[in-house]
Every structure is written in C-alpha cells, then in structure tokens.
Amino acid sequence: MNFWKKTQRNHGLEHGTISLLLSRIPHDQPMAGYSIPAGFFVVGDVTTGQISEAANEALLRMQAGEANLAISPFCGTNIVVGAALATAGTLIGYRLGGRGIRGINRAFSNAALAIAASRPIGRIAQQRFTTSADNPSMRIIDITRYQLGKFTIHWISTAF
C-alpha cells in the first residue's frame, strides 16, 4: 500500500478517535490531530487509556462499516477548502464587479458564500481525497505519550 493510502486511512482513524474522545470529555477542551503513513498524533489533555479506548473502538466501528467516523466537521481540509474558495471568490468578485465599491461589495459577498460552502465541500474533499474508512487489515501497534511543556501528545502507530 502506498504512503498516500496509509495516510488517508490513518487520517480517518484519527478523526474517529477524536470524535469519540470529544463525546466523552468536556467540550471546552481543545484537541487536534495530525496523520502520516505510520500513524497519527493526538494533541490534547487526555490519558493514554482514553486514547487507547477511543482509537480501538473507532477502528472496530469503522471496520464494521461505520464510515462516517472518518469525516470530521473540524478537519483542516475544511479550512483549506474554505480559504481557497474565499480567495478565489474574492478575486473573481472584485475583478468581475469592477474596481471600486461595486467590486469590493461583490468580493465580500463571494467570500461569504465561499465560507458558507466550505463545510459541505470540505466534507466531499475529505470523503474523496484526504480520509478513508477502508481499513480492514489496519492494526494499532502502540500508543506512546509525550509531554512537551503544557502539551500532552500521543503517538498512535499503526500497521496494515
């Protein structure tokens, strides 16, 4: 399996893990993740036991067909899609509206529409390009905790 497919699958499991964690801990607690071919990181004030429980449950549920766990409304893909759409909408609106107040109004309108569209389009981008729930042979190998100052980071290594 190539590095991109591994990253997509780890990204999906990262989303599933964080989704389950967020359903079990206070909602005001910040959390983030980052995936690579060998596994993924979770940054947040959670215990290794909580990470292990959530990651293993997410993997089992995804292997049982719960593909929606791989998609997250908080994913960075949505931010990138929103930024790209807003930039394109602003530039096109200003250019087509003509320079001056009319162009500025059109640019702002286009940017607002682009930001509103970013979540559903970001979801499609996640489904097609950046995540995958297709992980029948995936295994969690190890979970390692690191403390960097105030930040708790867990590394979840996986294999296929």
Region spans (language model):
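Short, charged cytosolic
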Residues: Y34-R61
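Conserved, well-folded catalytic cores of nucleic-acid-processing
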Residues: L20-R24, R61-G65, I92, R128-N135
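Short Lys/Arg-enriched alpha/beta "domain-start" segment
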Residues: M1-N10, G16
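Hydrophobic alpha-helical transmembrane segments
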Residues: L96-L113
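Catalytic cores of large soluble enzymes that bind and process phosphate-bearing ligands
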Residues: K5, R9, V46, Q50, ...
